[in-house]
A protein has these predicted regions:
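C-terminal hydrophobic helical "lid"/dimerization subdomain
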Residues: 1, 267-317
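Glycine-rich beta-strand-centered segment in the early N-terminal region that forms part
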Residues: 21-39, 47-88, 94-95, 102, ...
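NAD(P)H dinucleotide-binding glycine-rich loop of Rossmann-like/cofactor-binding domains
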Residues: 76-150
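Adenosine-nucleotide cofactor-binding segment
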Residues: 148, 164-223
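NAD(P)H cofactor-binding loop motif with strongest signal on the N-terminal glycine-rich segment
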Residues: 151, 239
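N-terminal Rossmann NAD(P)H-binding glycine-rich loop of SDR-like oxidoreductase domains
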Residues: 152, 160
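Helix-to-beta-strand junctions that scaffold the AdoMet/dcAdoMet cofactor pocket
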Residues: 228-229
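Rossmann-fold dehydrogenase core element
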Residues: 232-237, 246-286
Length: 317
């Protein structure tokens, strides 16, 4: 089969579109002939060696295609549960940026007729992550305010869509005025340029933020704690700008804040997110499409933070 593999850690130049052995399904696994996959920041981190993985390695967590043994159209849940620990397909195992993948049978679900392969490949990891943060952890309610940093990335657009589907109000940020304008068209209640505008002032004018979706870390942490209202919740699933901001512990007791750490999700989180997508309550925003053979260009686009939504890889059947 053809696959995208890395033989060493590094930049997009280490990605190789090459022949690789067909995977063999172990007991409890099934083979999926992939028709589409998508790109996540996880793929960039694995490519760079965080976490370090045995080489060669096929990247990719998300995918949709045809189950080889039954011919059924399926979507893959990328989460691998190990008790309280959840890992991801393509992190410590070969992933979906290939023509074939072997995955646990319990991770394969029938693909709703309303969804095409590209949409199905675009939603799982980011929507499952967002669902766990907003619904399972923070228990977001209709009418509450959600602060979403960096609208444009997959998790940000997924949290926006789930918040909107639940009847919450959204304050989104970006360093790109063009992305903010698109977010307004999608239905964002407030959209602020975090490089030139005052996010905290906008939050206070709205009455304070009930739930902060924190994925950035050092660059936004202080403003997140200033923007959240007393009794509010901060959900953390990443720290793309660095993991060691000043803690500002006094804000936690004075405001009686609750902080939730979250990563990926359970089978139940996946199914909850899937229901929102297939019912049409939450939209899946696809930024761009690249043939599997052009995955390097897809990585370069994500590295430049040019995307607004998910980057999809198309795989000929």
């Amino acid at each position: 089969m053809k696959a995208i593999r890395i033989h060493e850690d590094g930049g997009p130049e280490v990605l190789r579109y090459e022949d690789a052995p067909d995977p063999v399904a172990k007991p409890g696994e099934v083979l999926v002939s992939l028709r589409a996959a998508s790109l996540n920041h996880l793929d960039l981190w694995v490519r760079k060696g965080l976490p370090s993985a045995p080489k060669p390695r096929i990247l990719g967590a998300d995918g949709a295609g045809v189950r080889v043994d039954t011919g059924e159209r399926v979507v893959i849940n990328p989460g691998l549960e190990h008790g309280a620990v959840i890992t991801v397909i393509g992190e410590h195992t070969d992933g979906t940026h290939a023509e074939l993948v072997a995955v646990p049978e319990e991770n394969v679900f029938p693909l709703d007729d309303a969804l095409d392969f590209e949409t199905a490949a675009a939603f799982p990891l980011v929507f499952e992550t967002a669902y766990r943060m907003l619904v399972t952890k923070a228990r977001l309610q209709a009418g509450e305010w959600v602060l979403i940093w960096g609208i444009g990335g997959g998790v940000a657009t997924a949290t926006f869509e789930i918040a909107r589907a639940l009847g919450a109000r959204t304050l989104v940020t970006s360093g790109s005025d063009a992305k903010l304008e698109r977010a307004r068209e999608w239905g964002a209640d407030l959209a602020v340029n975090h490089a030139t505008g005052d996010v905290v002032a906008a939050a206070k004018e709205a009455g304070g933020i009930d739930v902060v979706v924190e994925t950035v870390g050092e660059a936004t942490w202080a403003r997140s704690l200033a923007a959240v209202k007393p009794g509010g919740r901060v959900t953390v699933c990443g720290a793309t700008s660095g993991p060691n901001p000043p803690a500002q512990l006094h804000r936690f007791w004075w405001k009686q804040l609750t902080v939730y750490g979250s990563t990926m999700g359970t089978r139940e989180d996946f199914l909850g997110a899937y229901e929102l997508v297939r019912s049409g309550k939450a939209r899946v925003h696809v930024d761009s499409r690249f043939p599997l053979s052009e995955t390097r260009a897809a990585h370069e686009r994500m590295e430049r933070a040019e995307q607004l939504g998910k980057i999809v890889l198309t795989i000929p059947g």
